[in-house]
Curated annotation (Swiss-Prot):
It comes from Clostridium kluyveri (strain ATCC 8527 / DSM 555 / NBRC 12016 / NCIMB 10680 / K1). This is Small ribosomal subunit protein uS11. Part of the 30S ribosomal subunit. Interacts with proteins S7 and S18. Binds to IF-3. One of its GO terms (molecular function) is structural constituent of ribosome. GO terms for cellular component: ribonucleoprotein complex; ribosome.
């Protein structure tokens, strides 16, 4: 083994894509909110989640946490030249509307809002009811 040799790792530079129109996928569950912004082909430009921003426990499921996640994701996507988005919302969480409003407030033009929550045609048995 050669003494004094250091293995260098080079980090690949992020490609700066130039995308005008994209899609925002908002997944809002009872526990967390995740906002992913993609180009038209579905390749991820940016994403953020309430838990990733430092919200923990029951604070992750608040509308404010979803708003912050959408804002962070939108700012990162606008660096790629994004101007308008289609919004696809999935899940029953409380951060749905707050995330959409935050995307509009960040300066993105929302061209479509669609609910893509999967609804079973009587598939799997749901979890038992909570008794509090």
């Amino acid at each position: 083994m050669a003494a004094g040799r250091v293995k260098r790792t080079t980090r690949r530079k992020k490609e700066r894509k130039n995308v005008e129109h994209g899609c925002a996928h908002i997944r809002s569950t009872f526990n967390n909110s995740i906002v992913t912004i993609t180009d038209a082909a579905g390749n991820t430009l940016s994403w953020a989640s309430a838990g990733g921003l430092g919200f923990r426990g029951s604070r992750k499921s608040t509308p404010f946490a979803a708003q912050m996640a959408a804002e962070t994701s939108a700012k990162a996507a606008m660096e790629h030249g994004l101007k308008s988005i289609e919004v696809y919302v999935k899940g029953p969480g409380s951060g749905r509307e707050a995330a959409i409003r935050s995307l509009q407030a960040a300066g993105l033009e929302v061209t479509l809002i669609k609910d893509v929550t999967p609804i079973p045609h009587n598939g799997c048995r749901p979890p038992k009811r909570r008794r509090v």
